[in-house]
């Protein structure tokens, strides 16, 4: 299995999450594809409005993502992993993220194990903005509906095609070993 997709949150928890994010994210505080402070992001590779969030502000969300990771890969018990990074992404016209992996390089304890993407909102008229995860040369198009989450190994190649109409907002969580 290359990924797991499901509705992780009930409607009330999801609405609370969106409300909290709306307060914290505010577009003036978000940065158009500049990445973390001091980092340059090549706009040919990635274009979106981004905001890094403190995962400790969203403990219920993080617990659900950790449980989903355990369901996806039972050898990774929720007690041995934790969400350490959250990022809000808003994709508008021409925004995209070319094929890439999320697993970084470095010591094993600092390598992302899982990537999750939760669809917060998308316009009814959205064209493009398609998420694909690749298994060898096979492309798996993942049609996330609002409120759904997909989780996959951070070593999996994936991409978001350019949005040509409408837009989408997602919350990305990265899970590490504790």
Protein language model regions, located:
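Catalytic core of non-heme Fe(II) oxygenases with the double-stranded beta-helix
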Residues: 59, 66-178
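Non-heme Fe(II)/2-oxoglutarate
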Residues: 1-80
């Amino acid at each position: 299995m290359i990924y797991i997709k499901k509705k992780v949150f009930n409607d009330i928890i999801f609405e609370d999450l969106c409300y909290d994010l709306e307060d914290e994210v505010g577009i003036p505080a978000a940065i158009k594809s500049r990445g973390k402070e001091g980092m340059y992001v090549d706009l040919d590779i990635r274009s979106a409005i981004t905001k890094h969030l403190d995962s400790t502000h969203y403990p219920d969300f993080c617990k659900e993502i950790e449980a989903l990771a355990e369901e996806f890969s039972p050898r990774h018990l929720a007690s041995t992993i934790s969400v350490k990074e959250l990022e809000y992404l808003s994709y508008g016209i021409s925004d995209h993220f070319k094929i890439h992996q999320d697993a970084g390089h470095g010591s094993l304890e600092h390598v992302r194990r899982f990537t999750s993407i939760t669809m917060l909102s998308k316009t009814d008229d959205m064209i493009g903005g398609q998420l694909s995860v690749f298994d060898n040369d096979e492309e798996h198009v993942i049609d996330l509906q609002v409120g759904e989450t997909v989780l996959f190994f951070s070593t999996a190649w994936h991409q978001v095609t350019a949005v040509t109409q409408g837009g989408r907002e997602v919350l990305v969580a990265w899970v590490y070993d504790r």
